[in-house]
Swiss-Prot record:
This is UDP-N-acetylglucosamine--N-acetylmuramyl-(pentapeptide) pyrophosphoryl-undecaprenol N-acetylglucosamine transferase. Cell wall formation. Catalyzes the transfer of a GlcNAc subunit on undecaprenyl-pyrophosphoryl-MurNAc-pentapeptide (lipid intermediate I) to form undecaprenyl-pyrophosphoryl-MurNAc-(pentapeptide)GlcNAc (lipid intermediate II). One of its GO terms (biological process) is cell division. It comes from Ruegeria sp. (strain TM1040). GO terms for molecular function: UDP-N-acetyl-D-glucosamine:N-acetylmuramoyl-L-alanyl-D-glutamyl-meso-2,6-diaminopimelyl-D-alanyl-D-alanine-diphosphoundecaprenol 4-beta-N-acetylglucosaminlytransferase activity; undecaprenyldiphospho-muramoylpentapeptide beta-N-acetylglucosaminyltransferase activity.
Amino acid sequence: MTQKLLLMAAGGTGGHMFPAQALAEAMLRKGWRVKLSTDPRGARYTGGFPHMTEITEVSSATFARGGLLAKAMVAPRIAAGVASMAMQMRRDRPDVVIGFGGYPSIPALGAATLLGLPRMIHEQNGVLGKVNQKFATRVAEVACGVWPTDLPAGAEGIHVGNPVRAAVLERQGAPYIPPGDYPMSLLVMGGSQGARILSDVVPGAIAALPETLRRHLRVSHQAREEDMARVAQFYADAGIDAEVQTFFADVPSRISEAQLVISRSGASSIADISVIGRPSILIPLATAAGDHQTANTRGLVEAGGAIRIPESALDTTSLAEQIAAVLTNAEGATQMAHAALSTGIPDATERLVARVEHLSEEAAP
């Protein structure tokens, strides 16, 4: 029997790449071949993909960036990417093509549309990204990570949840150690691209905590490269035990060990936090398209597993108060952890696998 081929296309952020990685792991176990099409930014996240994943980089571009000349070159680059991908697909025909969003997914989805191949998209957020918005009515279905998801008329949406990596599933529902008079871990995540506002506000908020609480904290803080030195220096000057990095390869482990997570509310972060089950303070990105990061928080916040602070209300004083409220109330923190866990969809990958297999079977002669 011929080995089936899944072609995945994903843009260059962790929010797109991590669900693709989870699907790759599962489909390889099912005996499928798996190809990943991404751009140089996305290639930074491929170190965690199974080694059997066939990875190619494509020509694409982001419409929103650059001056007039740069923007004038976008369409030719994307057209070249679609043409190149169509040639590859003719030589090595995928059984299913799935896009996870981001401009680098345009060549694969565009070529699959031209060739009439079975195709679908996975949308991680409660509001469709620009690329997924364009293709939502041109694919068989939209697998949705958050429900409800705003979909255009004519699009077929199915709730599957957001797939999480094997390293997250290994820690699914890991026992929560409530805060107390002993070393506690606090994880600060700005999403795969970091977040300057967290680097501006969080260190000061931690420094403003009572010394009786602050002395127990061990902070892991993800920051942009340009912010690393000043953030690390601030923690050092304040006598706070902190590790500052641009990217933590062991985020699932750090979430599991944390008494509290402070994070942006990208879809992958929300999925990881809820599947493992940890209290969180979430600060949605104010400029996120369609305010999708606020939409992503609804399930966790309404269940009582998270505290949401809009960027407009974020300052050191208010954040310090919320941190203290969680870390000085062991019973309340434990309830938050259980509530977060109740919102997780640990079988999201299996649900997405089922949709891929269904689409493949529907298209079979």
